[in-house]
Amino acid sequence: MDTSLKNNDGALEADNKNYQDYKDEPDKTSDVLDVTKHNSMVDCCHKNYSTFTSEWYINERKYNDVPEGPKKADVHRCTII
């Protein structure tokens, strides 16, 4: 199975939705985090993880420092379970 990001439309769709949620209501970042925890469980080449579970990943997004929305963080090639 090809797990490259270019074929990972489900993850892209979830990420875009969460970005839109963040942009529309930046004061509700925790809601976006909750949505992402439920929608972005991925099977990574190294381990299973939820996108926002790892503290370093939350810090990588730097919500408060990026007014136009969350930055994309480069992670291992993964695919939606």
From Swiss-Prot:
Keywords noted in UniProt: Early protein, Host cytoplasm, Host-virus interaction
Entry protein name: Protein L83L
Disulfide bonds: none
Region called Disordered, residue ranges: 1-28
UniProt keyword Cell division, yes or no: no
GO-annotated cellular components: host cell cytoplasm
Induction: Expressed in the early phase of the viral replicative cycle.
Main subcellular location of this protein, as a coarse class: host cell
Functional summary from the UniProt entry: May subvert the host innate immune response by interacting with host IL1B and interfering with its function.
Subcellular localization(s) per the UniProt record: Host cytoplasm
Native source species: African swine fever virus (isolate Warthog/Namibia/Wart80/1980)
Family from the record: Belongs to the asfivirus L83L family.
Biased composition (Basic and acidic residues): 14-28
UniProt subunit comment: Interacts with host IL1B.
